[in-house]
UniProtKB/Swiss-Prot annotation:
Keyword Glycoprotein: no
Recorded GO CC terms: plasma membrane
Protein known as: Uncharacterized protein MG384.1 homolog
Positions of transmembrane segments: 13-33, 38-58, 69-89
Assigned keywords, A-Z: Cell membrane, Membrane, Transmembrane, Transmembrane helix
Record membrane topology: Multi-pass membrane protein
Higher taxonomy: Bacteria, Bacillati, Mycoplasmatota, Mycoplasmoidales, Mycoplasmoidaceae
Keyword DNA damage among UniProt keywords: no
């Protein structure tokens, strides 16, 4: 009969493509609910890396995938996918998450932290000026007594 044709795309590859996305989603949800701060920097990075891995796996299906020019093209493709996905997901993250009510709480906390830092610096400068004033007020006078030699 004829020879068997190997499938170009193996369904087992989907496990390697989709499992990192699910793991990243669970990790980000865990971090979101366990920390008091909104970790918006991790979302674009994790999903950008996951999409980069997907493009790397999918680009292996090109014919003659190990040719020098095809490897260079795969490298450029992976970098472009990483950069575009990172910037697009970052923009979407900013639009969705930073407009939420929770982000306002975080922003108010950061502003409060800045005010506390400024107040503590002001208190330190007040203490320093007070200490300098007290130091300038005190005059140290030392009087040395001469010992009288006794003649016996």
């Amino acid at each position: 009969m004829g020879r068997e044709v190997e499938p170009i795309f193996d369904l087992v590859l989907l496990w390697f493509l989709l499992v990192p996305l699910v793991v990243y989603a669970l990790l980000l949800l865990l971090l979101f609910f366990t920390t008091p701060y909104l970790i918006v920097e991790a979302i674009p990075f994790c999903y950008g890396i996951a999409l980069m891995m997907i493009s790397l796996f999918m680009s292996g299906m090109f014919p003659q995938a190990w040719n020098v020019w095809v490897i260079f093209g795969r490298f450029v493709l992976v970098l472009v996918v990483l950069m575009l996905s990172f910037f697009v997901i970052n923009k979407l993250t900013n639009l969705v998450l930073l407009r939420s009510r929770y982000a306002m709480v975080v922003a108010q906390g950061l502003v409060h932290t800045g005010k506390v830092k400024q107040q503590s610096q002001q208190a330190m400068s007040d203490i320093k000026t007070k200490w300098d004033k007290e130091k300038s007020k005190t005059v140290v006078v030392t009087i040395k007594k001469k010992r009288v030699k006794s003649s016996d």
